[in-house]
């Protein structure tokens, strides 16, 4: 039973007093009698009836109801929702306005047809979706479970919908939890159960849940009838990682409740026979349903622009109606005396005044011209976007075979935003890297152990990369980077040395096997778990073992170790137990290894602490060495393993070795003690090899495997103890008192244990070096011990810098020994924090900070996180596409910088500005210094101070194209502390301006809040389109802030995916998603929206021009049936198909020419001037389509509809031909829809004209179309008018493609010229690799040859014309697949460097060229040809002549004249390109022609 705590009444009106809602809720058992009931049986029966009626405790029951409508509420509720869209309100208003007799233009019922049709389609879709939800709800609500019945005194089967808060539920293995349940009993002897949360967050690794304190010690089975405790917990919320509360027993004692005690709805019980719990939250109050908010809705940039243009159309509609109203009023005033000839007077003989007639005319024109607002545009956009999402999901190139996952489109309405991204913000760990940690190096007590053998072993797992073999020796690398540690400096560093490759290039089979296993365990491949020990460290471990073996029967065992050996011992103990790793068996992957020792439970109260740590208990409570040895022999690990075969077919059986073989150990010259324990290890090797570790963090698994390599083996973890297997000492069981988990603020985790050898309370801490080094106990320089500790810390810090410089992730390991008094004092405050319901997180945080102080440094580790496949190539392609990439990581600065070099985010020959500051004043000074340096290098001036906004010089959305004096823009590296200062209000403008001038930005040690603040800053200040990509929970905030959020389903769960708009398996798929699908989606939608605006404007223009011939009386010459259904039926399907299937550029051209992506960034397809040009063209076409039929039928005896029907026919044909001009890729569906539209129009017209004999007397459309089909003038007019109307657009498109083409038009021209030969030219600037000669056959099986037209003059720039010759395969190229790179050069072997400046491409000429001939064009701010490759020679244009020969020849002449002008104007600017002669190649290894924003010619 649950009751709300009484709250104070708030003042209010009489009769409407309301209580302030409390922050907690009280839950009681439903089996208890209600308060005030005298008869328990009667009270119980009453409570049972209340529960069955679904009103128990007046709270929501467990019934799931996701439907929005009922049979009675569907129509009004759905209409109410649809009328929230302004367009629907507008069209309904117009339809209702048509019911006014004085202003109606159409039949009232007919005017409602379009809007009713749109509303009906939307309503039917909503009804179907709601019905699907109803079926799903019914299925879930009628699932069964066991609920305890008071009347029957046993568990009975009931439906999920019959469960209420306060019920006791019993779940068996593999059953799904029906509600949020507090765990009170488990069949596990340790009070544990394992759950799978895949249905909740997508994570397949099992999680442990613990029985509430006080119930796990019960010997007998839990009886719900005896449960009388009261539960106080927090209100329902959607935080899956948080649950706070307490349970109050009859004796008044409280026990804290945490998320480990809560079983969430939707999770599945695994590896536990049965559990019992009480329902805390039911139905829609459960955390799962509170998190189920449905698909995210965002409004795309194109949609926002479209809404603005719709407003312009509304304004244009008002202006046209107002113009007609004024014209009609003036016309009435002028012909006042002749009004009786054309106006029917009223019954009293009076007539309308000019003003009144003008007002009526205004309203009537609003109705007539309503088509100007595209009624079907929004529905068409939804259909096109749904189809785009479908095709993206069906792209097999976005499927990852290794992880068996594919791209997911979670946001259905921002697909076009993928084609307009300007800034990418990326996490590092798990996004650019694999997040599969491999132990590489460590330092203990100031001594470094390089693990060279382990490095050599890892090298065998990756292929040799010839381009990255030149590595500077480690010492030089360290010395050069030694200055990185300064915290208040700004440096411009020229990177000269190479970095070690971090790319994993092992076999695909191994990678696939490892990824399959990674779904269930943290690390499973041999590369990641088989650690080769360092001989020196192994010798230290052996020496430590000898000392412990000699003193094994003495009391103070660890006191016999030297300080160095003691640190070694504690170092590996900390690696083993300072984590949350769960031990499992491969035979039963979901079965925890249990070797239970009879130890006392964890400390939960002060009384328990006093009893536990009295002197008598300290001597008798700990296990002796002899007993530990006995435990080792009596509790064989193999006996605890089930003998049943594995039921998980997806998991592979892994054989894990325990350390080195005995022969290898003996060969190192170890003592006989080492031989003895080595022989013992060999005996238990078969059982120990069956261990498997499941870790929530990859770092933890790597460290546990590293400790295992040194024979410190984690064999068991329970909620109150951790067992470790050691040589000679056997199995040590550490009592686990507390676990202080990792969080992004503390950046560390700690465990509090009682040591079995000393009975001391130890705190082991591991975390980031930036925080742990500051928590160490102060050292005195007076005594020798203090000086020694300072020396150790200094050495450790130097080694940490070495590890970070090599790209390794660093962690520091520390320890603290607590006295009894210190622990008692801390425990009291910690228990108070645990039992607090308000500010519990803050209190626990402060409690952890008080404990993690005065630490003793043990050592540090370096873990390698390898780059994902294809990351450098993807970053290079994205940069060529004009995208600026920022990496926001929480890693150490040196580590992040090294990874940035490895993934080509930073280049070795570029300048790097490193910004580290210790205060806000220092950060401001450093920013000013950086800005001065930027100005001195020839970049833009510093921003001026503005109010609330960045300077106007920030108006450019794309990254600046200006470069430094050395030709490259610098990169910026900033640490987390400096970033916090830079994000302050008074410094953010300077920081943003500096970052905008940099080629790359790397933010290190950044928190999740800082990540989101950086994204928000760029998005709001620069008005740029942003994309954030990450894989972990710490990336959720920036993913949600960005315009487009992309999540990666990696090692850290599915939180990022659940918060994202799109989910990709790996980072490399971002290239295809943006450059290909993003460009296509934007281009299709932009052109479709423009076409809808054009089509409606052109059709409205026909009606508007007619007003000049009818006195602006709002009359129409087109039948109202055509007016109503023309845009809705006859002309809506072809643009829809084009919007779904059109491809302006083939896939291979886009992928090999990322520069084409810039068209979307610059909004070339849809910008304001394009919109108004389109509207002007529509007005011209409407004038032509009106004038020619008017002249053709002038002075004829045809009636109004006979003249209007050819106009409608001409409009339809003009629309389709216009669409044909704008369509880039024609498919059979395009032809079918166009033919269907024409056929449908004539069919409807013939049927309608034949059946409508007396529709609109006296002028009726009877037999109109039949008569026109027999008139030659009709055919002549329908043929001539569309050609005349479209001639200017056709001429402009042809002229534009030949004189001033855009990059996209050039790419399309090459594709249209020869699909078989277009791939080679466009790939000459794709990736910058050169072959040995032009006749070399590549992996694709094609050979590229070069040639030039024979008619080309020798003085003209040589243009390559390529052809593909395939041996044994078809001659055509599959345009749906990316084409491999081919080159057009001969006789070259050295690769030519690529141009990295934005807007530049590389052209390699096949002809001879002087040494180092380069022409760099200045940016003009306008998108122009990629290179001279696309500007064809003068006479080669004759080959492009299409059916419109006059236009093509005129374009050729203009191109010839323009070429000569350019050649004359640039005489002497660039080096001439020599004419082609035979097979002569270039005379050097690096001959290229750089063509920028403007196309230049060299003589």
Curated annotation (Swiss-Prot):
Modification note: Autophosphorylated at the conserved aspartate of the P-type ATPase signature sequence.
Region of interest (Disordered), ranges: 1-53, 464-531, 1311-1356, 1464-1499
Main location: membrane
Keyword Cell division applies: no
Family: Belongs to the cation transport ATPase (P-type) (TC 3.A.3) family. Type IV subfamily.
Function: Catalytic component of P4-ATPase flippase complex, which catalyzes the hydrolysis of ATP coupled to the transport of phosphatidylcholine (PC) from the outer to the inner leaflet of the plasma membrane. Initiates inward plasma membrane bending and recruitment of Bin/amphiphysin/Rvs (BAR) domain-containing proteins involved in membrane tubulation and cell trafficking. Facilitates ITGB1/beta1 integrin endocytosis, delaying cell adhesion and cell spreading on extracellular matrix. Has low flippase activity toward glucosylceramide (GlcCer).
Name recorded for this polypeptide: Phospholipid-transporting ATPase VA
Organism whose genome encodes this protein: Homo sapiens (Human)
Gene: ATP10A
């Amino acid at each position: 039973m649950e009751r709300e705590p009484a709250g104070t009444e708030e003042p209010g009106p009489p009769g409407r007093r309301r209580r302030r809602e409390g922050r907690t809720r009280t839950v009681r058992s439903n089996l208890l009698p209600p308060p005030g009931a005298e008869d328990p049986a009667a009270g119980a029966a009453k409570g049972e009836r209340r529960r069955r009626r679904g009103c128990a405790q007046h709270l929501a029951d467990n019934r799931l109801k996701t439907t929005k409508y009922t049979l009675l509420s569907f129509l009004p509720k759905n209409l109410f929702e649809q009328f929230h869209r302004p367009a629907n309100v507008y069209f309904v208003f117009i339809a209702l306005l048509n019911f006014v007799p004085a202003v109606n233009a159409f039949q009232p019922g007919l005017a409602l047809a379009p809007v009713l049709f749109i509303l009906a389609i939307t309503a039917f879709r909503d009804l179907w979706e709601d019905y699907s939800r109803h079926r799903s709800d019914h299925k879930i609500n009628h699932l069964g479970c066991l609920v305890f019945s008071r009347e029957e005194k046993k568990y009975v089967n009931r439906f999920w919908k019959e469960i209420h808060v306060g019920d006791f539920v019993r779940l068996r293995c593999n059953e799904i939890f029906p509600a949020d349940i507090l765990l009170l009993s488990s069949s596990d002897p340790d009070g544990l159960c394992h759950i799978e949360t895949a249905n909740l967050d997508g994570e397949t690794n099992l999680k442990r849940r613990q029985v509430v304190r006080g119930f796990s010690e019960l010997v007998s089975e839990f009886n719900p009838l005896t449960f009388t405790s009261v539960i106080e917990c927090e209100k329902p919320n959607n935080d899956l990682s948080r649950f706070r509360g307490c349970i109050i027993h009859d004796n008044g004692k409280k026990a804290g409740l945490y998320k480990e005690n809560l079983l969430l709805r939707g999770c599945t019980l695994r590896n536990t026979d049965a559990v019992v719990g009480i329902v805390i939250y039911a139905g829609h109050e459960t955390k799962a349903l509170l998190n189920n908010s449905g698909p995210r809705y965002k409004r795309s940039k194109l949609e926002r622009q479209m809404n603005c243009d719709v407003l312009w159309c509304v304004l244009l509609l008002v202006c046209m109606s107002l113009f007609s109203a004024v014209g009609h009023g003036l016309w009435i005033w002028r012909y006042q005396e002749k009004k009786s000839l054309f106006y029917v007077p009223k019954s009293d003989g009076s007539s309308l005044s000019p003003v009144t007639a003008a007002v009526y005319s205004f309203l009537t024109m609003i109705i007539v011209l309503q088509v100007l607002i595209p009624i079907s545009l929004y529905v068409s956009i939804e259909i096109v976007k749904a189809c785009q999402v479908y095709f993206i999901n069906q792209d097999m190139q976005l499927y990852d075979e290794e992880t068996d996952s594919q791209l997911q489109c979670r946001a259905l309405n921002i697909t076009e935003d993928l084609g307009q991204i300007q800034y990418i913000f990326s996490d590092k760990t798990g996004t650019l890297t694999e997040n599969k940690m491999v132990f590489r190096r460590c330092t203990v007590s100031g001594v470094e152990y390089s693990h060279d053998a382990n490095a050599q072993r890892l090298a065998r797992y990756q292929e040799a990369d010839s381009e990255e073999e030149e590595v500077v020796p480690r010492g030089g690398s360290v010395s050069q980077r030694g200055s990185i540690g300064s915290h208040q400096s700004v440096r411009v560093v020229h990177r000269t040395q190479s970095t070690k490759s971090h790319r994993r290039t092992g076999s695909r089979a191994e990678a696939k096997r490892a990824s399959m296993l990674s779904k269930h365990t943290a690390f499973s491949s041999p590369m990641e778990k088989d650690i080769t020990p360092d001989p020196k460290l192994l010798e230290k471990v052996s020496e430590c073992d000898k000392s412990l073996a000699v003193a094994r029967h003495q009391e103070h065992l660890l006191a016999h170790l030297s300080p160095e050996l003691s640190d070694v011992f504690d170092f590996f103990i900390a690696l083993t137990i300072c984590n949350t790793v769960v031990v499992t068996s491969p035979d039963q992957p979901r079965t925890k290894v249990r070797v239970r020792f009879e130890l006392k439970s964890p400390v939960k109260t002060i009384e328990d602490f006093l009893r536990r740590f009295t002197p008598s208990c300290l001597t008798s409570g700990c296990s002796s060495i002899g007993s530990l040895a006995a435990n080792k022999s009596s509790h064989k690990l193999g006996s605890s393993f089930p003998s049943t075969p594995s039921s998980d077919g997806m998991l592979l059986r892994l054989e894990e070795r325990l350390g080195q073989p005995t022969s290898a150990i003996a060969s190192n010259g170890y003592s006989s003690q080492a031989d003895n324990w080595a022989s013992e290890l060999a005996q238990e090797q078969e059982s120990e090899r069956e261990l498997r570790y499941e870790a929530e963090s990859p770092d933890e698994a790597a460290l546990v495997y590293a400790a295992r390599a040194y024979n410190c083996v984690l064999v068991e973890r329970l909620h109150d103890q951790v067992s470790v297997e050691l040589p000679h000492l056997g199995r040590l069981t550490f009592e686990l008192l507390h676990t202080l988990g990792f969080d992004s603020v503390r950046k560390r985790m700690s465990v509090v244990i009682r040591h079995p050898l000393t009975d001391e309370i130890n705190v082991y801490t591991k975390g980031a070096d930036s925080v742990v080094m500051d928590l160490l106990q102060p050292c005195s320089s007076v005594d020798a011990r203090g000086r020694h500790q300072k020396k150790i810390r200094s050495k450790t810090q130097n080694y940490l810098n070495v590890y970070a410089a090599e790209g390794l992730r660093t962690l520091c390991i520390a320890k603290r020994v607590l006295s009894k008094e210190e622990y008692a004092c801390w425990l009291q405050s910690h228990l108070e924090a645990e039992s607090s319901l308000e500010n519990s997180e803050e209190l626990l945080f402060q409690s952890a900070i008080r404990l993690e102080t005065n630490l003793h440094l043990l050592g540090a580790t370096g873990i390698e996180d390898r780059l994902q496949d294809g990351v450098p190539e993807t970053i290079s392609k994205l940069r060529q596409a004009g995208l600026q990439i920022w990496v926001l990581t929480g890693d150490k600065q040196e580590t992040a910088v090294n990874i940035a070099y490895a993934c080509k985010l930073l280049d070795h020959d570029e300048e790097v500005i490193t910004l580290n500051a210790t205060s806000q004043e220092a950060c401001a000074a450093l920013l000013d210094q950086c800005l001065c340096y930027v100005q001195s290098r020839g970049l833009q001036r510093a921003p001026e101070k503005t109010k609330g906004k960045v300077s106007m010089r920030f108006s450019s959305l794309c990254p600046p194209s200006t470069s430094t004096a050395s030709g490259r823009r610098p990169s910026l590296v900033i640490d987390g502390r400096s970033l916090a200062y830079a994000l302050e209000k008074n410094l953010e403008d300077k920081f943003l301006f500096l970052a905008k001038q940099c080629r790359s930005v790397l933010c290190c040690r950044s928190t999740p809040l800082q990540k989101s603040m950086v994204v928000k800053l760029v998005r709001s200040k620069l008005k740029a389109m942003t994309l954030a990509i990450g894989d972990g929970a710490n990336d959720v905030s920036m993913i949600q802030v960005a315009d487009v959020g992309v999540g990666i389903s990696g090692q850290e769960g599915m939180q990022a995916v659940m918060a994202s708009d799109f989910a990709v398996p790996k980072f490399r798929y971002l290239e295809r998603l943006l450059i290909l699908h993003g460009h296509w989606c934007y281009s299709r939608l932009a052109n479709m929206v423009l076409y809808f605006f054009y089509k409606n404007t052109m059709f409205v223009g026909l009606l508007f021009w007619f007003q000049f011939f009818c006195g602006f009386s709002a009359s129409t010459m087109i039948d109202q049936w055509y007016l109503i259904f023309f845009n809705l039926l006859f002309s809506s399907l072809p643009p829809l198909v084009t919007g779904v299937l059109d491809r302006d550029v083939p896939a291979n051209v886009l992928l090999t020419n990322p520069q084409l992506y810039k068209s979307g960034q610059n909004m070339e397809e849809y910008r304001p001037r394009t919109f108004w040009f389109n509207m002007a063209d529509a007005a011209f076409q409407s004038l032509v389509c009106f004038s020619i039929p008017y002249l053709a039928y002038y002075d004829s005896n045809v009636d109004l509809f006979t003249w209007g029907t050819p106009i409608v026919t001409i409009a339809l044909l003009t629309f389709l031909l216009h669409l044909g001009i704008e369509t880039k890729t024609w498919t059979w569906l395009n032809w079918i829809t166009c033919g269907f539209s024409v056929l449908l129009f004539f069919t409807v017209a013939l049927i309608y004209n034949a059946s409508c004999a007396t529709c609109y007397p006296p002028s009726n459309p009877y037999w109109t179309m039949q008569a026109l089909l027999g008139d030659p003038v009709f055919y002549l007019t329908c043929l001539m008018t569309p050609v005349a109307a479209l001639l200017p657009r056709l001429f402009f498109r042809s002229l534009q493609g030949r004189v001033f083409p855009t990059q996209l038009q050039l790419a399309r021209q090459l594709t249209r010229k020869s699909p078989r030969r277009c791939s080679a030219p466009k790939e000459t600037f794709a990736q910058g690799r050169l072959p040995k000669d032009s006749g070399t056959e590549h992996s694709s099986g094609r050979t590229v040859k070069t040639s030039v037209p024979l008619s080309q003059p020798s003085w003209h720039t040589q243009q390559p014309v390529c052809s593909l010759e395939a041996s044994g395969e078809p001659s055509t190229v599959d345009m749906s697949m990316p084409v491999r790179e081919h080159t057009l050069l001969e006789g070259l072997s050295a690769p030519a460097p690529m141009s990295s400046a934005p807007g530049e491409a590389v052209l390699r000429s096949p002809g001879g060229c002087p040494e180092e001939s380069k022409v760099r064009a200045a940016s003009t701010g306008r998108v122009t040809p990629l290179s001279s490759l696309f500007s064809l020679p003068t006479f080669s244009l004759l080959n492009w002549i299409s059916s419109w020969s006059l236009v093509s020849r005129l374009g050729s002449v203009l191109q010839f004249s323009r070429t000569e002008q350019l050649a004359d104007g640039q005489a002497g600017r660039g080096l001439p390109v020599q004419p082609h002669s035979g097979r002569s190649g270039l005379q050097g290894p690096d001959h290229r022609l750089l063509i920028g924003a403007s196309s230049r010619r060299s003589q």
